[in-house]
Design a protein with these regions (language model features):
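Conserved NTP-donor binding/palm subdomain of two-metal-ion nucleotidyltransferases/polymerases, i.e.
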Residues: 1-129, 135-361
Length: 361
């Protein structure tokens, strides 16, 4: 493993409160190494958290620079400020949603981003994307209308979810938690998630906005990561999310086997234990060495920030084909088949034809 990758994991272990190990080696990083560390942290969706680790090391060693170029430190601080501001703005929109669903007596579950951030040592340092919300009782259309009446804009509606904006923040109003028409497994999962959602925890006290219980997150987070891993790859942020969920569940994740994802989970848990310092037992980290190394290398070498927006239709098709064909090896790990994946993809595009024009963002 390169010195930059080793430094990344060291800083993450420190930031996640898992390490008091020696960190003098960070002073030996070159200017080029620091730049690579910054870019790698961004690609992995963990730039703010890595900087938390850097700040802790600076205090521990009483060294305000560690050899990091001043301009790079300023750029990193600027990115940190941007991440915090985006999170804080998104949280205000979440509070607005809480007011909306409460005034309309429309119990709803917030899931993914903001709710997962509360598992982190510094919640507003976990980068979040869209806001994902599910109106209990199948009231997705009513929730869309309530958001629009409150000043939001409805952009699109697909079988799985609508797309809206409120306060310039993208919101996905879910009809389903997963693409339930993909397979029997997906249908079972969506039904199970609805069952879990009906027993959610309060997110904002005194409102009708709820957060998933641990059973929901145990199933949804690993399935969501597996889908990303299948089609485009995942970042270390997916692994940190999963490890915090496993920690919250006290390592009781046996229901993951119902999804056929116990082997994938074991690889992620081992990365969490060996590289990120999570205290997991061998029983949930058992995987063969070649698979472990291949998954780890795939994650460290991925660039999920590459956008498919504003490219031609044929370029988009070409990229989708290249991604799909290059990831044939992952299907066995995910308890799936390559040809089954092709069928599922075709079904998804038939159900929502315009989705073929949408790429990675």
């Amino acid at each position: 493993m390169s010195s930059v990758n080793q430094s990344l994991f060291l800083l993450l272990r420190i930031a996640l409160n898992h390490s008091t190990e020696e960190c003098d080696a960070l002073r030996n990083l070159s200017v080029v190494d620091w730049q690579r560390l910054y870019e790698l942290s961004k690609r992995q969706g963990l730039a703010a958290i890595v900087f938390d680790g850097i700040s802790a090391v600076m205090v521990r060693l009483n060294d305000k620079s560690l050899g990091m170029p001043r301009q790079l430190k300023l750029r990193w601080l600027s990115l940190l400020d941007s991440i915090e501001n985006k999170y804080d703005h998104q949280y205000k929109v979440v509070q607005k949603l809480a007011q909306i669903v409460t005034s309309q007596n429309m119990p709803s579950v917030l899931f993914k981003g903001v709710t997962l951030s509360l598992l982190y040592p510094v919640p507003n340092h976990r980068q979040c994307g869209d806001i994902d919300i599910y109106a209990l009782g199948g009231r997705g259309d009513s929730l869309d209308k309530a958001i629009v009446d409150a000043g939001g804009k409805l952009l699109d509606v697909s079988p799985k979810h609508s797309e809206l904006t409120l306060g310039d923040v993208m919101i996905e109003g879910h009809r389903y938690f997963v693409q339930r028409y993909f397979s029997k497994r997906a249908k079972w999962l969506d039904n199970r998630l609805v069952e879990c959602a009906n027993n959610s925890d309060t997110f904002i006290e005194g409102t009708k906005l709820y957060a998933p219980n641990v059973q929901f997150d145990t199933l949804f987070v690993i399935y969501h990561a597996a889908n990303h891993f299948k089609f485009e790859g995942i970042s270390l942020r997916h692994i940190v999310d999963w490890c915090f969920v496993v920690q919250r569940a006290n390592c009781n994740i046996s229901e993951v086997a119902q999804l056929g994802l116990e082997h994938f989970s074991a690889v992620l848990c081992r990365i969490g234990r060996d590289c990120l310092g999570f205290d997991f037992p061998d029983s949930i980290c058992q995987c063969d060495e070649p698979t472990y190394q291949r998954v780890l290398n795939d994650i460290l070498g991925s660039d999920l920030n590459k956008s498919d927006e504003n490219v031609s239709f044929f370029t988009l098709l070409k990229r989708k084909y290249e991604r799909f064909s290059s990831r044939r090896w992952v299907y066995k790990l995910l308890g799936d088949t390559y040809w089954g994946g092709i069928v599922n993809s075709v079904v998804a595009h038939l159900v929502h034809p315009l989705s073929i024009f949408k790429g990675s963002k």
